[in-house]
Amino acid sequence: MTQPAVPPDTYARATAYTDVFDRIDALLEGETDWIAAMATVACELHHTFDYYDWTGFYRAVSDDLLVVGPYQGSHGCLRIPFDRGVCGAAARTRETQFVPDVEEAADHIACSSSTRSEVVVPVTTPDGQLLAVLDIDSDTLDAFTETDTQMLEQLATRLGEQFASTEQR
């Protein structure tokens, strides 16, 4: 089995993110439904990057619980408390979690045994309310770079601003 293609350099990654963000912006222009937005973002990201093997959102449904939202890939964990796993850590701390090797992360929850690396970015409103976390898993060890993290954080900020008034949790 061949490994998924990982863009070789920072410029290629940044360009790919810029292109997908342009598509996402066009698709979400005027959109007010948070669930539809999450589904669209997950789909666009997942089909743009070959090294993304699970791409989706866990919605913040209370002050201490995430529930799986729209995603692409195999099944996800259904519920994740804030005190468990990489997604829980991102929700709890409101900070991006960058995990080059999930085998080295003591708190990693193995929703899929094939996952080797992960990045999780909180999606918060400008006033700090957590809407969701964006979770990206790869079956490739050390698949993500600082460029991935920075670009996903930019996307999360934009989503948090656009959907700050959503009633859907």
Regions found by a protein language model. Give the residues of each.
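Intrinsically disordered, low-complexity terminal regulatory regions
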Residues: 1-75, 154, 158-169
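Short hydrophobic/aromatic beta-strand element in the GNAT-like acyltransferase core
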Residues: 54, 120, 133
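Regulatory sensory and allosteric helical modules in signal-transduction proteins
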Residues: 60-113
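A short acidic/small-residue loop/turn micro-motif
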Residues: 74, 138-139
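A short, aliphatic-rich beta-strand micro-motif
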Residues: 117-125
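Sensory-domain boundary capping and coupling elements
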Residues: 124-138
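A short acidic/glycine-rich loop-to-helix N-cap element
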Residues: 141-148
